[in-house]
C-alpha cells in the first residue's frame, strides 16, 4: 500500500530513516514560516494570516508531491519570489499587494496549463547532462553560502563584496553547528543533521541566540486567513506592464524549480541514464497547483526547496519523507511558538554539510572538454555570486550554446 501511494518500498527503505529525513527537511526549511510573513507584511498584508497561508500552502504542495510524484522534494514559498513580490512589485512598481497577488494567481494558472502541455518537462529534459551535474553542485554551493551568510560568518564588505564576519554568539553557534554536523556524519550517526539542529538550539539558550519569550506557551490557535483570502484586484491588471510582470514571475519560477529538481534528482540517484527524471510532470504539477491555491490563501509563489537535500542526505528517498514534512507543516499551525524558537544559526551546519554532499556531482562533469567544463563552471559560480539559482542556470545555458556554436559543435546544441 505504501509503495503504491508514496513509493515507499519496505524491502529497500527504512521507515525510521524516512521519518528522520522528513523531520530534517522540515527543520531546515521551517524558517520560511517566519521569514515569509515578515517579508509580505512589509506590503501591508496581515502577518498572522500570511503565516497560516504559508503553512497551509507549504503542506498542500508538499503532500501533493508526496502522493503524485512520490519523491522527497518538499515545496514552500520561494524566497526569491516573495522578495520580488514585496520589494519590486509593491514597493518598487507601486502595485497594491492585492494586484500583485492577482498576478501570482494568474501565473499559477498558466503554470498548470503549460505543465499539463508538457512545456516545463521539455525545458527540463533539454538541459545537457554535464550542466545537470553542475547545477547540482552549484545548488550545493548556494545552500552553503546561504547558511554562512545568514549566520553572519560571511558579511558584506564595500571593497571586496564579502568578508569573514566578526565573532558573535550567532556566528560562533553556527561554527559549532558546522563542526558538530561534520563529526556526527563522519561517525555515521543516523539523523546526524537533525540531531545537530536540536543540540545547537539547546546550546543557543545560554548564548542568548535561542530566545524564549516571557509567558511562553508552545501551543496557539491558528490565525484566520480572512484578511488575505482571495483578495484579488483586477483593476490595474490588463496592462502591458502586468503582462511583463506575469512573464517574469513565470520565467523565474520555471528556472528555480527546474534547477532545483535537476540538482535534487542527481543527488538522490533517481535520474535515469538518459538524464530523464521519473515523475517530473507530477512534481511540476504539484508546484503549479500549490502556487495557484497558495496565492488564493495569501501566500507567494510556491517552488521546490533546495533544503530538501538535507532530508535526502539523511536517507529520504520516497514520498513518505514528504508525508512527514507535510504533516509537520500542518502541526506548525498550532505549535508556531515552539518551532520558531529554532534560530537560523542552528541550521547552518546542516546547510553547509548538504552543500558538501551535493558537490560530489561535480566529479561527473567532463573537465577535460572545455566546451563542457566552462559552462559548468559558469553555472556553479554564478549561482553563488548572483545569489540566484535561476540566474546561474540561464548564464550557464547561454555559455553552453555560445561555446558549442563557437567551436563548431552546433549539433550538440539541442
Residue spans for each PLM region:
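Loop-to-helix transition at the N-terminal end of transmembrane alpha-helices
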Residues: 44-63
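Helix-loop-helix hairpins and the membrane-proximal interhelical loops
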Residues: 1-49, 162-163, 195-281
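Helix-loop-helix junctions within the multi-pass membrane cores of secondary transporters/permeases
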Residues: 2-36, 57-58, 78-87, 91-136, ...
Amino acid at each position: 500500500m505504501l509503495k503504491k501511494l508514496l513509493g515507499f518500498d519496505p524491502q529497500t527503505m527504512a521507515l525510521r530513516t524516512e521519518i528522520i529525513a522528513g523531520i530534517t527537511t522540515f527543520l531546515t526549511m521551517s524558517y520560511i514560516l517566519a521569514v515569509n510573513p515578515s517579508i509580505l507584511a512589509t506590503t501591508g498584508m496581515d502577518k498572522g494570516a500570511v503565516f497560516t497561508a504559508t503553512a497551509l500552502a507549504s503542506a498542500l504542495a508538499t503532500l501533493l508531491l508526496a502522493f503524485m510524484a512520490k519523491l522527497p522534494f518538499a515545496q514552500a514559498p520561494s524566497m526569491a519570489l516573495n522578495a520580488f513580490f514585496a520589494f519590486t512589485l509593491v514597493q518598487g512598481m507601486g502595485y497594491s499587494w492585492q494586484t500583485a497577488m492577482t498576478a501570482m494567481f494568474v501565473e499559477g494558472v498558466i503554470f498548470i496549463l503549460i505543465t499539463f502541455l508538457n512545456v516545463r518537462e521539455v525545458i527540463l529534459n533539454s538541459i545537457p547532462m554535464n550542466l545537470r551535474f553542475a547545477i547540482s553542485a552549484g545548488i550545493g554551493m548556494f545552500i552553503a553560502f546561504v547558511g554562512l551568510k545568514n549566520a553572519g560568518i560571511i558579511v558584506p564588505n564595500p571593497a571586496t563584496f564579502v568578508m569573514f564576519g566578526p565573532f558573535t554568539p550567532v556566528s560562533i553557534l553556527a561554527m559549532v553547528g558546522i563542526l558538530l554536523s561534520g563529526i556526527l556524519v563522519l561517525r555515521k550517526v543516523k539523523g546526524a543533521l537533525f540531531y545537530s539542529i536540536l543540540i545547537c538550539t539547546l546550546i543557543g539558550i545560554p548564548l542568548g541566540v535561542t530566545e524564549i519569550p516571557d509567558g511562553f506557551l508552545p501551543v496557539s490557535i491558528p490565525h484566520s486567513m480572512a484578511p488575505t483570502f482571495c483578495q484579488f484586484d483586477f483593476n490595474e491588471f490588463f496592462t502591458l506592464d502586468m503582462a511583463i510582470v506575469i512573464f517574469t514571475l513565470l520565467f523565474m519560477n520555471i528556472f528555480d524549480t527546474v534547477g532545483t529538481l535537476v540538482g535534487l534528482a542527481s543527488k538522490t540517484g533517481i535520474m535515469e541514464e538518459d538524464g530523464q527524471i521519473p515523475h517530473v510532470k507530477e512534481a511540476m504539477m504539484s508546484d503549479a497547483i500549490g502556487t495557484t491555491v497558495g496565492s488564493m490563501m495569501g501566500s507567494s509563489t510556491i517552488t521546490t526547496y533546495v533544503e530538501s537535500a538535507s532530508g535526502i542526505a539523511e536517507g529520504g528517498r520516497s514520498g513518505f519523507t514528504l508525508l512527514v514534512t507535510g504533516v509537520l507543516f500542518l502541526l506548525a499551525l498550532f505549535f508556531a511558538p515552539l518551532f520558531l524558537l529554532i534560530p537560523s544559526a542552528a541550521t547552518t551546519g546542516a546547510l553547509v554539510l548538504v552543500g558538501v554532499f551535493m558537490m560530489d556531482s561535480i566529479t561527473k562533469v567532463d573537465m577535460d572538454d572545455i566546451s563542457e567544463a566552462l559552462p559548468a563552471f559558469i553555472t556553479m559560480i554564478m549561482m553563488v555570486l548572483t545569489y540566484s539559482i535561476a540566474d546561474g542556470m540561464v548564464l550557464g545555458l547561454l555559455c553552453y550554446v555560445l561555446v558549442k556554436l563557437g567551436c563548431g559543435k552546433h549539433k550538440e546544441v539541442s
